Amino acid sequence: SLIQDISGSGAGWRGPALIIGAIGILLGMYLFPTLKHHRSIVNFIFVFPLLFTFVVTVIIPLCLGVFYSFTDWNGIKMTGFVGFANYKAMFNEPSFLWSLIITILFVVLNMVLVNVVAFMLALLCTSKVKGLSFFRASYFLPNLIGGIVLGYVWQFVFNNVLIKMTNNISLLSKTNTAMMAIIVVYIWQYAGYIMLIYVTGLTQVPKDVLEASQIDGANAVTTLFKIKIPMIAATITICTFLTLTSAFKQFDVNMALTNGTGSVASFFGNYLTNGTQMLALNIYNTAISKNNYALGQAKAILFFIILAAVSIIQVRISNKKEVEM
């Protein structure tokens, strides 16, 4: 029945297909009558749709992407293999190297700034200030706005509102200030989400431990650095890696706010016009705007390797901290 739907064939075979499937399940239960086998069959039935979707939407495209990165694929067909030519061209492309460098800088800065801002907001939202629910909702709200919409809204703010405070010079007109603007927008968008995770971690700190520290004469600063922060070390690790992976994948705000434009006078002797173009946007422009799908796919594979390495490190560190706790 699923094959009929995918192929677009008529629905006349849907009923017989479902009946055959049901008969197959009953036959399997008859051939394997034990409860253990029945549970295995039922588990497979429920897991199969998710597993099938994962294979079709993730595994197969990934394998095809690796394959196409070694060819001269133009999005429709390929004429032959080119080996590592796309990877060599990638690392010989000044605009790509620039995008890789500013993406790493963007990730490092945001990994620190977002977590600091989010942690401070979390401390505020776990204090005894009135209206905490309002503050939590207000800080989290920007995360619910789509990145494209957010980028165009802030583009209007920078070009039409804040321009009056900067001598009629938009912050988006220069590469350095435009990157600062992207960082500000990213912090404004993502800090509220990270804040909620920190709030969860802070609220799980045992109250009797905090009360004991107060009895022992510990002030707020000592309690923060000696008790709260060590006890939410696992939460800090999670938030750090969430911010890291999210910053690496920055695309929509970058596209809507600056579209990667910005001049760089000299980068290894080259004049660049993609001063604010980060890695994800560079991959998109290579494949879509320049119609160089094979080179774009090679860049995407490198991008995947970076994110996979970050994820593996995160899992290892998280597991290590859980064992220590």
Role assignments for model-derived ranges:
Residues S1-H38:
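Transmembrane alpha-helices
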Residues L2-G10, R39-M325:
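A structural signal for multi-pass alpha-helical bundles of membrane permease subunits
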